Amino acid sequence: MALNSGSPPAIGPYYENHGYQPENPYPAQPTVVPTVYEVHPAQYYPSPVPQYAPRVLTQASNPVVCTQPKSPSGTVCTSKTKKALCITLTLGTFLVGAALAAGLLWKFMGSKCSNSGIECDSSGTCINPSNWCDGVSHCPGGEDENRCVRLYGPNFILQVYSSQRKSWHPVCQDDWNENYGRAACRDMGYKNNFYSSQGIVDDSGSTSFMKLNTSAGNVDIYKKLYHSDACSSKAVVSLRCIACGVNLNSSRQSRIVGGESALPGAWPWQVSLHVQNVHVCGGSIITPEWIVTAAHCVEKPLNNPWHWTAFAGILRQSFMFYGAGYQVEKVISHPNYDSKTKNNDIALMKLQKPLTFNDLVKPVCLPNPGMMLQPEQLCWISGWGATEEKGKTSEVLNAAKVLLIETQRCNSRYVYDNLITPAMICAGFLQGNVDSCQGDSGGPLVTSKNNIWWLIGDTSWGSGCAKAYRPGVYGNVMVFTDWIYRQMRADG
């Protein structure tokens, strides 16, 4: 976690670290012909450094001045022939630009379906919304029948999709009990032993509900529900599928400013991910079994789970040599991750043995649909990354306060010049001074809402550390929650 831009070291290689990877802890290797970003691992051992291409800004940061001379009349095209040619060229340029924009939009948004269709992830087939959650599988992978339940907003309102209305509706409290709550959480991908509690939220303003049919028999929870315009209790169900987003010392968080050492229990979801006893990346606990990290951390050869050990609840790296780590059983990288652009930079790790939760080890909440992020929203980053550019991994866990930066501003030519996709979030300060850095990759970007901490980003990339107009870039977890739940369901 960098407090400011460090100076280049007096000796050794100096290079722009665009992915926040840690320094290579292995001894120097025989001299080879260098390439700018290539990492040469020690013989017989996998490199603990995530290997990937750096982000390169495509334009200079200074404005480009057009020096084309104009005619005395103030226009370039004077004759009829020239005017016709200019119009043709202008129209052609516009059409080409529109086609490129459409192609980029399709690429980054990742769906080929129109507004009237929903895409099957397994095949790319477009399904009519009326066929989604109708009790019949239309997608080859069956995802149209297992993505019918969700939690909405910061109050965890339980919603179920209605194929009749082609929209999501809250579940009426009438006849509801804990058993149904556990079943709904299980449908999302949580295990029964994760279940926390259910609540009731006054939602008398709603005019459309999903109500329980108690005589429906032993079927999936969404098949027990039917659409109704009335709810006798005038209350809807709120579910906590796991006790998440709670930390210690919440009243003392203002003391952790600008990258200071973290307090015990302040960031209990933070894990240190090691390869061969060396910290490589960070991660965030979302259940006793699942860790969220960055896809660039687990590029080959580090996609093999046996390389990885996770440490939770320990603030100092030196103490991890004496503590028991948790071996990783499975590594799942997002299938659409692009190692060049860092688009869809998210991955999951499943642990061989579940974590035991306590005051120092707790999960962070995944964001729910309906949660809106605001420009300059207060967030926090944490990790064992370097405290200055080109520095070494920190001994202690650090945390720092950052602000969200709106995508339009972050995509300006003076910042990242259209490198930011909908699957990314910018956070930090345009003046620099506070940022993620080498070794922070995969770690959390969190924000507090309703006294609950939410994971809204995973540390992805940047241009150097804490440089002006080069804020940190994070994977947009709000885009990936459906994918995360799908992996949890498939492995449940």
From Swiss-Prot:
Residues 1-84 are cytoplasmic. The chain crosses the membrane at residues 85-105. Its main location: membrane. Residues 340-470 are annotated as: HKU1-CoV S protein-binding. GO terms for cellular component: extracellular exosome; extracellular region; nucleoplasm; plasma membrane. Changing Y416A: No effect on catalytic activity. Almost abolishes HKU1-CoV viral entry. Changing Q431A: No effect on catalytic activity or HKU1-CoV viral entry. Changing R409 to A/T: No effect on catalytic activity. Reduces HKU1-CoV viral entry. Glycans are attached at N213, N249. Plasma membrane-anchored serine protease that cleaves at arginine residues. Participates in proteolytic cascades of relevance for the normal physiologic function of the prostate. Androgen-induced TMPRSS2 activates several substrates that include pro-hepatocyte growth factor/HGF, the protease activated receptor-2/F2RL1 or matriptase/ST14 leading to extracellular matrix disruption and metastasis of prostate cancer cells. In addition, activates trigeminal neurons and contribute to both spontaneous pain and mechanical allodynia. This is Transmembrane protease serine 2. It comes from Homo sapiens (Human).
